[in-house]
């Protein structure tokens, strides 16, 4: 029997019971907030939706006035939020329960380490493994921080419901508290009135570290070492999970990211982890009341105690307490120096010194037979220090290649080296850049020529990066990503800019230069680009200084918008294969940074399946992947969910590393030609609609809420890099978000049905061939399973109502093209999977959608009516906010956005 996903163990009855309680309280709160006739409309709309009587539902909605729509929208937006909380609580319960009874589930770390332990090089695998979830901000993250805080309170109350049922807590008091928070939610603005600033995004993401990441990462690292030790594998300093972050350093398309935000991002996370250490040290100070009249201590601990300023006579015989007091004081001085530039002679120069003091205490406890004290708070602190050091996450810097080129061109012109650099050929550009990097020691910016604002900002943020690395350590900023990388000159231009502040010289690069290949064309050309780069003597030296590792980032969002779902997935797969082989040819370990979003249209889907379906050889011992703003709350909103999702990332990576050692990659060689043929058709079908159909642009802007999405105050970054006059100018994230809102989900499936149908029709054996591929090839199975999931969340009846907003019949007819492809795709997917219905292999998701769909379907119909009124000029400026409430509710119901 196949190992079950943990979600399959969920207690459907418990969820339904909790949802019934939440719904009942929400109804009571709504009834007291609005006129009786308005609440009666809510009851009627709910009944009609459950009965699938949407024509009657549409008729009622069209008769509601704007004030009625406001309160009704809020009700139906809150309901899926409460359902989400109940599901999250049950998942947290199951995570703990299944671990406590030692029940196996997919991604369980103990099972995975047992598998790894059977390999000859098990210790090397486990020691070197490093998986890095990189947290990003998100221009379509819809939840306000205030709403997230309120949901946390309800989450904690629901976690106590089992105690209420057992009579351990007073039910009336519990329900009153629950009612209080639901009432607050119903009276709290769901949508921001002001656009987020980068500083807000930094503060918001820090809350996840306080509530979940610090404890989850620490626990996972501790379990990882313990399980390895049980198998006789001694690990020195494993770091299976380290954290990354873009917030404060990702300025691609975001003019509000500056040198100041980079510093703030680094110093804020430094302060957060230091405060955590301070709290842990204080707990240890209070608890470690060991007396020298009873137990001995080491000389090292005595020395630490003697340095303490705790002169209380009551602690003369309590050296551990005084030692912790001294460490706490020294750490506080370190924090003040790093964060506030306050000098002190008594501070830690680096995290190794801090750790050494803690290890001295540990050694003393071991020597004096007090090992039980090493468990709990002390070990948790020590593991946190090993996992995080003096900052929580390494910050990535990112900028578009065109900005680098313009900056370098300005520098070269001001230094009178090349007047019009941008007009040079690629070969000539590389010649100029290599000369600057290899033989010209000049700082190009050290002229008296005036500089553009853009160049000043770029040089300032690079200087800030240098300052932070010097102060906090090399790993605070490890890589700089180049968006829209197309050529070797794109990589060398960044190197020239880094050279300006001393982060690159002829022998080493203190910041790794990471190309991001995004479009189908750039991914196809990536192997040639990297081959040319790896041949450079300069690049060889830089990579040697990075232990022969070279990272490459892969863009899932733009490649999907550019070529469609199948083309994106297959092009990324082939690019990884080729780039991995090129790395082997040059003695370089190519590692991949997967720029996945939350939705399938942006490379999303179940993390475990995504990782275990990567090409053979493409995962060695390092893997980085983005965790984008709108899914961070879903996956890491509490410490149990965070542990489970981090555990899955580590287990999946180990699984793929071991599997590729024991599996013959030639087994799938016969499938490549098939995929090339199908994907070629899919690419053409997708491009014919999205880029070549003259009516598609008008259809998208009329039959989706893209304009309303673009006006939402839901992120610091603009929705487009420039004014939107064509599909290519739109960012991938709001593109996908809008298709999610109108329930077409086009980026996750369009072009799949027709391309597979053509292949199947060519030969009677082709369907069985595809079925075999689905059964035996993880990549193909994951590819189609994601399509299955997207189709299940789409709703063509709702999509048709959006299509009616198109004024021209020619434009409106685009819907029928989409509908035909949707129906064909569903039919083909089920025939390849050999299933009778969608989500047959994901029963937990099917059950979840079945009981939440009726509620947030209502929101779609309300949204359509509101957009009609907006376009007819029947909504005031203030009432436009109602559309944003429906957008929020639909995204909440789908559990993802862009």
From Swiss-Prot:
Q: Which InterPro entries match?
A: PEP_COase (IPR021135), PEP_COase_bac/pln-type (IPR022805), PEP_COase_Lys_AS (IPR018129), PEPCASE_His_AS (IPR033129), Pyrv/PenolPyrv_kinase-like_dom (IPR015813)
Q: Which Pfam families match?
A: PEPcase
> Which SUPFAM superfamilies does the annotation name?
Phosphoenolpyruvate/pyruvate domain
The active site of this protein is located at 138, 561
Q: Which reaction does it catalyse?
A: oxaloacetate + phosphate = phosphoenolpyruvate + hydrogencarbonate
Enzyme Commission no? 4.1.1.31
Q: Which prosthetic group or cofactor does it need?
A: Mg(2+)
Q: Name one GO biological process term.
A: oxaloacetate metabolic process
Query: What's in the GO CC field?
Result: cytosol
What are the protein's GO molecular function terms?
Answer: magnesium ion binding; phosphoenolpyruvate carboxylase activity
Keywords of this entry: Carbon dioxide fixation, Lyase, Magnesium
Question: Which top class of enzyme applies to this chain?
Answer: lyase
Q: What does this protein do?
A: Forms oxaloacetate, a four-carbon dicarboxylic acid source for the tricarboxylic acid cycle.
Per the record, the similarity remark reads: Belongs to the PEPCase type 1 family.
Q: What is this protein called?
A: Phosphoenolpyruvate carboxylase
- Organism equals Streptococcus suis (strain 05ZYH33)
What is the gene name?
Answer: ppc
């Amino acid at each position: 029997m196949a190992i079950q996903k943990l979600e399959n163990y969920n207690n459907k009855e418990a969820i339904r019971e909790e949802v019934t309680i939440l719904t009942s309280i929400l109804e009571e709160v709504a009834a007291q907030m609005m006129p009786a006739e308005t609440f009666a409309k809510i009851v009627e709309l709910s009944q009609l939706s459950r009965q699938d009587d949407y024509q009657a539902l549409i008729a009622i909605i069209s008769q509601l006035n704007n004030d009625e729509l406001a309160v009704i929208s809020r009700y139906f937006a809150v309901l899926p939020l409460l359902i989400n909380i109940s599901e999250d609580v049950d998942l947290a319960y199951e995570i703990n329960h299944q671990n406590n009874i030692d029940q196996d589930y997919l991604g369980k770390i103990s099972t995975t380490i047992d598998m790894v332990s059977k390999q000859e090089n098990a210790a090397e695998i486990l020691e070197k493994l490093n998986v890095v979830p990189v947290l990003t901000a998100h221009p379509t993250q819809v939840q306000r921080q205030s709403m997230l805080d309120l949901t946390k309170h309800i989450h904690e109350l629901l976690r106590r419901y089992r105690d209420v049922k057992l009579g351990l807590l007073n039910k009336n008091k519990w329900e009153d508290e629950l009612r209080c928070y639901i009432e607050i939610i119903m009276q709290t603005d769901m949508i921001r009135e002001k656009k987020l600033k980068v500083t807000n995004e930094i503060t918001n993401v820090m809350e996840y570290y306080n509530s979940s990441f610090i404890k989850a990462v620490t626990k996972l690292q501790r379990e990882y070492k313990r399980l390895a030790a049980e198998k006789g594998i001694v690990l020195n300093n494993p770091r299976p999970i380290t954290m990354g972050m873009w917030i404060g350093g990702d300025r691609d398309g975001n003019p509000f990211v500056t040198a100041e935000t980079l510093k703030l991002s680094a110093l804020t996370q430094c302060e957060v982890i230091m405060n955590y250490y301070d709290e842990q040290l204080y707990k240890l100070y209070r608890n470690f009341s060991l007396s020298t009249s009873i137990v001995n201590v080491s000389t090292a601990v005595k020395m630490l105690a003697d340095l303490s300023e705790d002169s209380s006579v009551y602690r003369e015989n309590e050296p551990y307490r005084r030692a912790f007091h001294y460490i706490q004081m020294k750490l506080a001085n370190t924090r003040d120096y790093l964060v506030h530039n306050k000098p002190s002679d008594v501070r830690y120069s680096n995290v190794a010194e801090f750790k050494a003091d803690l290890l001295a205490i540990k050694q003393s406890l071991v020597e004096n037979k007090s090992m039980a004290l090493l468990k709990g708070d002390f070990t948790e602190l020590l593991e946190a220090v090993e996992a995080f050091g003096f900052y929580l996450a390494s910050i990535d810097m990112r900028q578009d290649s065109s900005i680098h080129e313009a900056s370098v061109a300005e520098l070269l012109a001001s230094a009178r080296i090349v007047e019009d650099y941008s007009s040079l050929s690629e070969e000539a550009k590389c010649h100029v850049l290599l000369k600057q990097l290899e033989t010209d020691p000049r700082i190009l910016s050290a002229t008296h020529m005036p500089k553009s604002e853009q160049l000043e900002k770029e040089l300032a943020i690079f200087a800030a990066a240098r300052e932070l690395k010097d102060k906090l350590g090399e790993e605070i900023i490890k890589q700089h990503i180049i968006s829209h990388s197309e050529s070797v000159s794109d990589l060398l231009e960044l190197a020239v800019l880094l050279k300006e502040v001393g982060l690159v010289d002829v022998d080493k690069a203190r910041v790794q230069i990471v190309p991001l290949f995004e479009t189908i064309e750039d991914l196809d050309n990536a192997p040639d680009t990297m081959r040319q780069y790896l041949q450079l003597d300069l690049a060889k030296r830089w990579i040697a200084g990075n232990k022969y590792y070279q990272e490459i980032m892969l863009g899932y969002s733009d490649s999907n918008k550019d070529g469609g779902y199948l083309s994106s997935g297959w092009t990324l797969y082939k690019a990884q294969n080729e780039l991995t082989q090129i790395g082997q040819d040059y003695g370089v370990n190519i590692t991949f940074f997967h720029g996945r979003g939350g939705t399938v249209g942006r490379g999303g889907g179940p993390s475990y399946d995504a990782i275990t379906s990567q090409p053979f050889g493409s995962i060695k011992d390092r893997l980085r992947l983005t965790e984008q703003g709108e899914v961070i709350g879903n996956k890491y909103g509490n410490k149990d969910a965070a542990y489970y999702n981090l555990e899955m990332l580590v287990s999946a990576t180990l699984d793929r590393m071991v599997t590729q050692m024991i599996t013959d990659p030639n087994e799938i060689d016969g499938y490549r030609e098939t995929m090339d043929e199908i994907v070629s058709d899919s690419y053409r079908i997708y491009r014919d609609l999205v880029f070549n159909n003259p009516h598609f642009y008008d259809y998208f802007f009329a039959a989706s809420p893209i304009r309303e999405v673009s006006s939402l105050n839901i992120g610091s970054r603009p929705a487009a890099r420039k004014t939107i006059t064509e599909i290519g100018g739109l960012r991938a994230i709001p593109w996908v978000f809008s298709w999610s809102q109108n329930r077409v989900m086009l980026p996750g499936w369009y072009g799949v049905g027709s391309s597979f149908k053509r292949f199947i029709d060519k030969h009677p054996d082709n369907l069985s061939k595809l079925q075999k591929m689905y059964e035996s090839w993880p990549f193909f199975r994951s590819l189609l399973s994601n399509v299955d999931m997207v189709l299940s969340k789409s709703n063509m009846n709702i999509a048709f109502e959006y299509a009616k907003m198109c004024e021209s019949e020619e434009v409106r007819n685009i819907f029928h093209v989409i509908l035909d492809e949707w129906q064909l795709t569903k039919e083909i997917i089920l025939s390849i999977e050999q299933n009778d219905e969608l989500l047959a292999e994901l029963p937990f998701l099917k059950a979840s959608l079945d009981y939440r769909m009726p509620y947030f379907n209502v929101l779609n119909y309300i949204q359509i009516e509101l957009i009609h009124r907006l376009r007819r000029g029947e909504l005031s400026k203030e009432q436009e906010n109602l559309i944003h409430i429906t957008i929020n509710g639909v995204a909440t119901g789908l559990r993802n956005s862009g």
